[in-house]
């Protein structure tokens, strides 16, 4: 996926598109390129199943609507076919936490805004799990003694493993998630949904605050 630090991303691209100059990309762009790869390089004509979690799950919806005659089945879990307003607002919050770092410099930083990345991780942890998750201390099943250990782990994970511009590039793609976005359906969401021919199993998440049953 573009922006993830492995494919073309703000920290891994040509100079005039690097860092804060990296273009905004949608899931339509991602799936269009994935389609070119598997059809032109690997000569694949049909896909038996597209599945994934979170943004990968969003891409499974996108595949099914963008190429309805190619995809036989999808199984997105903890994902949505269109990012909700609530989800969008949550992402604005974690983005604000990151960009408040004095080293952010509008994305033109000389060193990673580590304090902002840590803040991003700590704020995100409050959304990635539900009230019940914390009330029932389910974090102990993940190996954490208490909630502070979980918060610290999330903070350090983001500080050590993410480039800030990469992270915000993915967030922008997530916020723009809408299977009707692009030249095929021109923002007609209902038409895009009706175009899906793939057999579908939808798996919501019971333990987060933004991809529960009502959001998928």
Task: Name each model-derived stretch.
Residues 1-58, 65, 69-82, 86-91:
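Gly/Pro-rich cap/lid or specificity-loop segments adjacent to the active site
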Residues 124, 128, 167-174:
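Short alpha-helical scaffolding segments that buttress acidic/His motifs in well-ordered protein cores
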Residues 169-192:
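Active-site nucleophile elbow and catalytic-triad environment of alpha/beta-hydrolase enzymes
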Residues 195-200:
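Short, proline-enriched alpha-helix->beta-strand connector loops that line the catalytic pocket
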Residues 207-211:
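Acidic catalytic loop of the alpha/beta-hydrolase fold
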Residues 214-216:
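Conserved small/polar residues in nucleotide/adenosyl-binding loops
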């Amino acid at each position: 996926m573009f922006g993830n630090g492995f494919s073309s991303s703000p920290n891994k691209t040509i100079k005039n598109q690097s860092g804060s100059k990296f273009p905004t990309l949608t899931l339509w762009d991602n799936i269009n390129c994935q389609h070119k790869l598997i059809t032109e390089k690997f000569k694949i004509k049909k896909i038996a199943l597209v599945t994934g979690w979170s943004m990968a799950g969003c891409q499974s919806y996108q595949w099914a609507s963008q190429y309805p005659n190619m995809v036989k089945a999808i199984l997105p879990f903890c994902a949505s076919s269109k990012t909700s307003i609530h989800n969008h607002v949550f992402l604005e919050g974690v983005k604000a936490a990151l960009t408040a770092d004095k080293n952010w410099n509008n994305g033109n930083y000389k060193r990673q805004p580590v304090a902002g990345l840590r803040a991003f991780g700590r704020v995100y942890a409050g959304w990635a799990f539900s009230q019940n998750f914390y009330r029932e201390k389910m974090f102990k099943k993940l190996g954490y003694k208490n909630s502070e250990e979980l918060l610290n782990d999330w903070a350090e994970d983001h500080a050590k493993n993410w480039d800030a511009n990469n992270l915000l590039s993915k967030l922008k793609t997530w916020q723009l998630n809408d299977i009707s976005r692009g030249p095929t359906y021109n923002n007609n969401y209902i038409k895009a949904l009706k175009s899906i021919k793939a057999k579908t199993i939808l798996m919501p998440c019971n333990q987060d605050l933004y991809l529960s049953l009502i959001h998928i």
